[in-house]
Amino acid sequence: MIRTIQRQSATRFSSALVQRRLYSLASDSLNKQRKPQEEGRLARIFKDPSNKAWKDLTAPQKAYRTSANIGNFSIVIFGGGVFGLIIYALVTSIWKGEAHYGDEAFELLKANEECRYVFGDHMKALGEATHPLRRTHGILTSRVWDHHGVEHLVLQFHLIGNERKGHVFGRLVNVQGDYKWEYLFVDVANYGKIIIFDHTNSVRQQHKNFGLWGSLKNITWGN
């Protein structure tokens, strides 16, 4: 009886060892350190050690280092070119773009005598809302072409001051790449149009300016 129990316990112990050994072999296979792969022939030929001087490099290594330097230099040049184009576009849009003419129009309005009388010396320019949910405003500009193919730049914005509000209209013509003013006026609610200048006579022909006391008069202010 004792021998039977010993045999059974020995069998169980040996089976447990086998199971444990199987699991240990699986874990050992996962934890074994992989041998580094041997480099190929081309890798050994073109490998460029960074600690080697130029004179110590072989011809293929010199070619590899030269091509790498040229590639890095090309990336730097390309990035600098893109950055330069962005800066050029920003500068030209500020100094020669549409925003420049909006500022110029506002300065002309502030210098006009009738505009100062109607809107006061502390008049403000307010552009059109770019989005219903945004508070930022910008001058509304558009480019149009007439039947002769000539380009025109049209701008609009609001002028406020002395509890009055006016709608400013301006138009410029493209003359060999340079924009020239055609007309600039502001339409004031319950007052009429204040014409700053009209080189085309298109606005003045339709304009009937009301005097200060409501009488119909053709009065020129600040011209």
Curated annotation (Swiss-Prot):
Keywords: Membrane, Mitochondrion, Mitochondrion inner membrane, Protein transport, Transit peptide, Translocation, Transmembrane, Transmembrane helix, Transport. Residues 1-23 form a transit peptide. Residues 96-223 are mitochondrial intermembrane. GO terms for biological process: intracellular protein transport; protein import into mitochondrial matrix. GO terms for cellular component: mitochondrion; TIM23 mitochondrial import inner membrane translocase complex. It holds the Pfam family TIM21. Residues 24-74 are mitochondrial matrix. InterPro entries: Tim21 (IPR013261), Tim21_IMS_sf (IPR038552). The chain crosses the membrane at residues 75-95. It is a single-pass membrane protein. The keyword Transit peptide applies. It is found in: Mitochondrion inner membrane. Component of the TIM23 complex, at least composed of tim23, tim17, tim50 and tim21. Essential component of the TIM23 complex, a complex that mediates the translocation of transit peptide-containing proteins across the mitochondrial inner membrane. Required to keep the TOM and the TIM23 complexes in close contact. At some point, it is released from the TOM23 complex to allow protein translocation into the mitochondrial matrix. Belongs to the TIM21 family. This is Mitochondrial import inner membrane translocase subunit tim21. It comes from Schizosaccharomyces pombe (strain 972 / ATCC 24843) (Fission yeast). The lineage of its organism: Eukaryota, Fungi, Dikarya, Ascomycota, Taphrinomycotina.
